[in-house]
């Protein structure tokens, strides 16, 4: 969790109070503010399995992506550069898409896949 905390807080600049809930068994979590009412929460996988009562399975980066929509091609480049500097693995460098947008993909320290994307039809 410390590596992910550092990545999201120090590398990507997301606001957080750090890791809280350490006093509880299976309770350690860090919340990052994304926008009003929307937060990213990071937990240890064992703790998620315990809390949800689901069997822990092998991680797969292709289960889902987290989309980070921005307002310009330049902003895609900036976010991707910040992620790389923070330790992300760039899986697809920023590029023009077949549908007229611009995007790139990276994996965070835990292997979660992010797409940073500009859609010319959306106002951000």
Task: Label every PLM stretch briefly.
Residues 1-47:
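Core segments of cupin and vicinal oxygen chelate
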Residues 25, 47-54, 123-124:
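A short, acidic/glycine-rich surface segment
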Residues 30-34, 53-124:
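Vicinal oxygen chelate
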Residues 39-41, 65, 113:
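Short hydrophobic-acidic sequence motifs that mark active-site Asp/Glu residues
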Residues 43, 52-54, 116:
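Short, charged, solvent-exposed linker or helix-capping segments at domain edges/interfaces
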Residues 36, 46, 70-72, 108-110, ...:
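Non-catalytic surface loops within mature trypsin-like serine protease
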């Amino acid at each position: 969790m410390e590596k992910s905390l550092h990545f999201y807080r120090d590398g990507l600049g997301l606001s957080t109070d750090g890791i809280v809930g350490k006093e509880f068994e299976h309770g350690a979590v860090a919340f990052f503010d994304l926008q009003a009412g929307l937060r990213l929460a990071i937990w240890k996988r064992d703790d998620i399995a315990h809390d949800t009562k689901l069997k822990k399975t092998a991680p797969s980066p292709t289960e889902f992506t987290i989309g980070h929509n921005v307002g310009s091609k330049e902003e895609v480049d900036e976010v991707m550069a910040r992620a790389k500097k923070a330790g992300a693995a760039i899986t697809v460098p920023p590029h023009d898409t077949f549908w007229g947008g611009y995007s790139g993909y990276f994996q965070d320290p835990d292997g979660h896949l992010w797409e940073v994307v500009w859609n010319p039809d959306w106002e951000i």
